């Protein structure tokens, strides 16, 4: 468990990696379906509860159980009519049901214990509903109904039961998903792809052509729609967006892909998540050099340079603020297959300090000269950079070479681009210039630490690779 997290979910693949002398990798995916495990913290405050936890530590290891996934709650989108089989749900939570054959429905769950809970078997999923095998003979209302997916699992050997007083105890219970068939899958559009909806900045780019959405701009560009919004007491920006078919329903705290990065580059996906800089160690960088140390233990030693490339390992902690962000992270990890596939990820730090802006038709970026230019000159790996701007845009450039140049008696670093720039970016508009590294996950396991049913954090670690060569 990480920090104060009470619920932990883990997905784990298995990848065999063969590394050649020059650092190139050949990766073999040996597990097609990831192992899935859960950890829940249970607190017992009565003798009965404490004895129940004690009993759970002594059960036969071969016993199987269905457990609710408490962090994957699903909500009704409309009231349920009795004698029906279709539960129409909020589709934001559809992916929570992936692979589940059974569900548990809590109705009017309150401290007075006047509610009930029902267990039902799933027949299939549609784009907006759970279709049950048997009907439910009572009405249910979306305001006081919760649906939890059930998974068949075994209970892993438990840690020690911790007593806090004579009648109270605590235990972290670890459950291992048995991954038994049949597994009922949600529709493919929920199962595989990013569930993005419309982003505010995508609508801004497509509708108002990158103009700032100031009040004066909206008044001038869309006077009729602006007046309609004011007359109805609505936010003009929201009203105008919806008039063009946009749904301002998914903004992910306004920080998920806030720099409008593309989804792919050079045929590889781009990871949009970025560090949140909450803790002092929120992001880190370690560097692996491809060398051998030759040491005969007599005192003298030398290093044998396999190649002049170094390999960065980027690690950072990121938070996911709603269910779509959490599920997008899981989907991305599954598409990568753990360490198997490579993808692009920005370093999210200032790797270069620009001296002047980027000019249209030019293929050079002048920066402050640092000692790292010596490393750049010897590194033979092709790299890319991404320029983040203060108006939340991003521009990717391939680097052809590095050089230095003396201008007016002062030396500057010079990034030589593979192509001439097709845009002018003034220096005062640049937020930072980061490397866009081609990486893979450095671990086959993804561990999500939940702070609420739709809020989680994860620490990602990614190692630079040479796949593009």
Residue spans of the language-model regions?
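Extracellular/virion structural assembly segments
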Residues: 1-128, 134-469
């Amino acid at each position: 468990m990480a920090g104060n997290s009470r619920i932990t979910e883990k997905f784990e693949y298995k990848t065999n990696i063969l590394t050649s002398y020059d650092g190139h990798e050949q990766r073999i995916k040996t597990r097609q379906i990831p192992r899935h495990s859960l950890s829940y913290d249970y607190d017992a405050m009565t003798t009965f509860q404490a004895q129940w936890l004690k009993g759970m530590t002594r059960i036969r290891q071969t016993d199987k159980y269905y457990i609710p996934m408490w962090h994957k709650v699903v909500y009704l989108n409309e009231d349920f009519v009795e004698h029906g089989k279709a539960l129409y749900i909020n589709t934001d939570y559809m992916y929570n049901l992936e692979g589940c054959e059974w569900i548990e429905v809590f109705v009017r769950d309150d401290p007075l214990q006047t509610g009930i809970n029902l267990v039902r078997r799933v027949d299939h999923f549609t784009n907006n509903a759970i279709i049950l095998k048997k009907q439910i003979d009572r009405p249910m209302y979306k305001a006081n109904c919760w649906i939890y997916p059930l998974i068949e699992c075994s209970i892993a050997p438990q840690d020690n039961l911790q007593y806090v007083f004579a009648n109270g105890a605590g235990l972290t219970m670890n459950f291992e998903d048995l991954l038994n068939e049949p597994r009922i899958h949600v529709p493919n559009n929920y199962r595989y792809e990013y569930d993005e909806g419309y982003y505010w900045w995508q609508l801004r780019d497509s509708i108002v052509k990158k103009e700032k959405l100031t009040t004066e701009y909206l008044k001038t560009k869309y006077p009729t729609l602006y007046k309609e919004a004011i007359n109805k007491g609505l936010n003009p920006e929201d009203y105008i967006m919806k008039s063009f078919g946009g749904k301002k329903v998914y903004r992910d705290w306004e920080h998920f892909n806030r720099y409008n990065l593309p989804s792919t580059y050079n045929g590889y996906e781009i990871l949009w998540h970025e560090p949140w800089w909450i803790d002092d160690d929120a992001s880190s960088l370690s560097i692996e050099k491809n060398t051998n140390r030759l040491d005969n233990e007599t005192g003298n030693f030398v290093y044998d340079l396999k190649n002049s490339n170094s390999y960065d390992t980027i690690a950072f902690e990121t938070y996911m603020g709603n269910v779509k962000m959490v599920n997008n992270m899981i989907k991305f990890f599954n598409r990568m297959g753990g360490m198997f596939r490579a993808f692009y990820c920005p370093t999210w730090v200032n790797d270069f300090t620009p001296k002047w802006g980027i000019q249209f038709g030019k293929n050079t970026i002048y920066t402050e000269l640092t000692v790292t230019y010596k490393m750049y000159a010897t590194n033979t790996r092709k790299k890319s950079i991404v320029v983040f701007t203060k108006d939340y845009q991003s521009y990717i450039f391939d680097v052809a070479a590095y050089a230095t140049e003396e201008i007016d008696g002062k030396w500057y670093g010079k990034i030589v681009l593979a192509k001439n720039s097709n845009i002018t970016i003034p220096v005062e508009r640049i937020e930072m210039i980061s490397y866009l590294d081609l990486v893979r996950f450095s671990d086959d396991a993804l561990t999500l630490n939940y702070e609420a049913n739709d809020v989680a954090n994860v620490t990602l670690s990614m190692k630079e690779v040479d796949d593009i060569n």
